Amino acid sequence: MTQLSSNDVPSMGRRQFMNLLTFGTATGVALGALYPVANYFMPLRAGGGGGGTSAKDELGNPITKTGWLATHQAGDRSLVQGLKGDPTYLIVNEGGEIGEFGLNAICTHLGCVVPWDSGANKFICPCHGSQYDTNGKVVRGPAPLSLALAHVDIEDDAVLVKQWSETDFRTNENPWWA
């Protein structure tokens, strides 16, 4: 058997080069497409050591208790970014303090964001007319379930939103969202 000298060994051909280029491009696109999927299932969390997520305003800035109470009066229900970035109502109770629970603003019927109607003193879904009382309990369908609850905690003036896994105080049942 004869050995070929280094001058006789063929270099990478055009076909092999195109195969490597195609494989590299496809791999890059696939990895780029998987990043948002992985981020959805394992979101980055901001917050304290208690596992909470820092509530954020419409610009994505963390909310502080003193800043929030300076601009929101008793009985106010305003949207913040809560768990998983979902719109969540932060409630200022009648004592002028931030309530111990927040309400996920996503309607349980078809997923519309449910606005607070201060004149009617309830949440009314603009899509199909579902209505929820001041605590987010469904009072008129077609929504089948109450709005999801979230714990609201204050740690060093930071407003944190945490997963609610206890019994739903509105229905005395296990939470459907946990």
From Swiss-Prot:
Disulfide bonds, paired cysteine numbers: 112-127
Membrane topology note: Single-pass membrane protein
Enzyme Commission designation: 7.1.1.6
Places the protein is found: Cellular thylakoid membrane
Keyword set, alphabetical order: 2Fe-2S, Disulfide bond, Electron transport, Iron, Iron-sulfur, Membrane, Metal-binding, Thylakoid, Translocase, Transmembrane, Transmembrane helix, Transport
Entry keyword annotation includes Thylakoid: yes
Leading EC class: translocase
Family: Belongs to the Rieske iron-sulfur protein family.
Protein name per the record: Cytochrome b6-f complex iron-sulfur subunit
